[in-house]
């Protein structure tokens, strides 16, 4: 298994890059999110890789971050999502955006990606739903996720509300709210919505 490659970037032709590692050139498919972060040709690059082996093909996929690679691996475990579709998903959405789409169960966002229809988007959301941590997403989004927000989010999730409902409730909270007041405001909001 090839888990990481460090070498000189020789060629960039989306979605393919060529990385020279001590005289051996590795062709690596990368999502556009990684492609846009690559250094100039001739510069040193490190990619976290996934070696894809099937009967008729051996491919190397590269990612700028371990999170992208881990998400790619999760995506390709889903029925109907192959390596190319997984790459397309990561090219169309950042890791954070995809996590937010899963937490909020936003299939419309996913259907905008070429090759993802409504049924595939719904299956993807269903299978990833339990694998995504909403508290981590709140932090990733940089949404000024204070400890108060995290505590309110955790409490609402523990009460059985889904990620989409909780996100909507958190958006309507007033600034500087305490945990107990935030939970009360959120519960009032959620009782009106249902």
UniProtKB/Swiss-Prot annotation:
Spans annotated as Flexible linker: 140-143
Cellular component aspect of the GO annotation: cytoplasm; Holliday junction helicase complex; Holliday junction resolvase complex
Entries under SUPFAM superfamilies matching the protein: DNA helicase RuvA subunit, C-terminal domain, Nucleic acid-binding proteins, RuvA domain 2-like
Keyword DNA damage: yes
Biological process, per Gene Ontology: DNA recombination; DNA repair
Span list, region Domain II: 65-140
Keyword entries, A-Z: Cytoplasm, DNA damage, DNA recombination, DNA repair, DNA-binding
Family: Belongs to the RuvA family.
Subunit structure: Homotetramer. Forms an RuvA(8)-RuvB(12)-Holliday junction (HJ) complex. HJ DNA is sandwiched between 2 RuvA tetramers; dsDNA enters through RuvA and exits via RuvB. An RuvB hexamer assembles on each DNA strand where it exits the tetramer. Each RuvB hexamer is contacted by two RuvA subunits (via domain III) on 2 adjacent RuvB subunits; this complex drives branch migration. In the full resolvosome a probable DNA-RuvA(4)-RuvB(12)-RuvC(2) complex forms which resolves the HJ.
Domain notes: Has three domains with a flexible linker between the domains II and III and assumes an 'L' shape. Domain III is highly mobile and contacts RuvB.
Protein name: Holliday junction branch migration complex subunit RuvA
Source organism: Nitrosomonas eutropha (strain DSM 101675 / C91 / Nm57)
Gene: ruvA
